[in-house]
Amino acid sequence: MNTTTEQDFGADPTKVRDTDHYTEEYVDGFVDKWDDLIDWDSRAKSEGDFFIQELKKRGATRILDAATGTGFHSVRLLEAGFDVVSADGSAEMLAKAFENGRKRGHILRTVQVDWRWLNRDIHGRYDAIICLGNSFTHLFNEKDRRKTLAEFYSALNPEGVLILDQRNYDGILDHGYDSSHSYYYCGEGVSVYPEHVDDGLARFKYEFNDGSTYFLNMFPLRKDYTRRLMHEVGFQKIDTYGDFKATYRDADPDFFIHVAEKEYREED
């Protein structure tokens, strides 16, 4: 695990557009601040039971949390009665998630994975995979995105579902950044905004009330592009929600949530 609190993006941070760099971005100092950014109580109130209901109405019981972070969704799903395996590419995040789970009376089953080789490190099949917190946008090239979606598809049962979210990068690219931060980033005294945006990079700055500052470099995925990749990998039916609502104007949501079903559907 990293033992540093300092991020390193080199001389020109906007040139860091590498899928493998994200593990270096989640240094101990940033991970320690993450729960200030993701206020658990506020986030639970903002989300309501959206994910729990989406899973329950499909009869899902065995869930892979593919982007565990500090454990918010893993713990919520465990408390709702689901069988959860908690995965992440960051050892620092998994350690924090395990600690958070233990504080709430749960022992998380954690596994460090690289999504591109997911099925090498996890075992069995799942009724659902969740990939939340804008995590999919850490993948900077299409080959990695296709491989990851294929790995997710393979890890699902025949009637399984993938729930994947992303920032509304369409709105940021086309209209600039304007967010009330009413979803996902709910912590008080935390400022989150893009320092640099172009078609190949969204560099977000995270400012905390103690004066500390961190950054994440991510790829600005457009909504319809993500949906197309899902279809091409094999997902049959994809519903996209804007800030947990089925009806929305494309420019309005902070986040999109894609609910992609694997179940094969014959054409009429």
UniProtKB/Swiss-Prot annotation:
Control of this protein's activity: p-chloromercuribenzoic acid inhibits more than 95% of the GSMT activities on glycine and sarcosine, and S-adenosylhomocysteine (AdoHcy) inhibits completely GSMT activities.
Family the UniProt entry places it in: Belongs to the class I-like SAM-binding methyltransferase superfamily. Glycine N-methyltransferase family.
GO cellular component: cytosol
Molecular function per GO: glycine binding; glycine N-methyltransferase activity; identical protein binding; S-adenosyl-L-methionine binding; sarcosine N-methyltransferase activity
Residues holding substrate: 134, 167, 206
pH dependence statement: Optimum pH is around 7.4 and 7.9 for glycine and sarcosine, respectively.
Task performed by this protein: Catalyzes the methylation of glycine and sarcosine to sarcosine and dimethylglycine, respectively, with S-adenosylmethionine (AdoMet) acting as the methyl donor. It has strict specificity for glycine and sarcosine as the methyl group acceptors.
Gene Ontology terms: biological process: glycine betaine biosynthetic process from glycine; methylation; one-carbon metabolic process; protein homotetramerization; regulation of gluconeogenesis; S-adenosylhomocysteine metabolic process; S-adenosylmethionine metabolic process; sarcosine metabolic process
Residues binding S-adenosyl-L-methionine: 26, 34, 43, 67, 88, 114-115, 132
Main EC class the enzyme belongs to: transferase
Subunit note: Monomer.
Domain of life: Bacteria
Protein name: Glycine/sarcosine N-methyltransferase
Pathway given in the UniProt record: Amine and polyamine biosynthesis; betaine biosynthesis via glycine pathway; betaine from glycine: step 1/3; Amine and polyamine biosynthesis; betaine biosynthesis via glycine pathway; betaine from glycine: step 2/3
Xref: InterPro entries: Gly/Sar_N_MeTrfase (IPR014369), Methyltransf_25 (IPR041698), SAM-dependent_MTases_sf (IPR029063)
EC code(s) of this entry: 2.1.1.156
Matching Gene3D superfamilies: Glycine N-methyltransferase, chain A, domain 1 (3.30.46.10), Vaccinia Virus protein VP39 (3.40.50.150)
Lineage: Bacteria, Pseudomonadati, Pseudomonadota, Gammaproteobacteria, Chromatiales
Reaction catalyzed: glycine + 2 S-adenosyl-L-methionine = N,N-dimethylglycine + 2 S-adenosyl-L-homocysteine + 2 H(+); glycine + S-adenosyl-L-methionine = sarcosine + S-adenosyl-L-homocysteine + H(+); sarcosine + S-adenosyl-L-methionine = N,N-dimethylglycine + S-adenosyl-L-homocysteine + H(+)
Keywords: Methyltransferase, S-adenosyl-L-methionine, Transferase
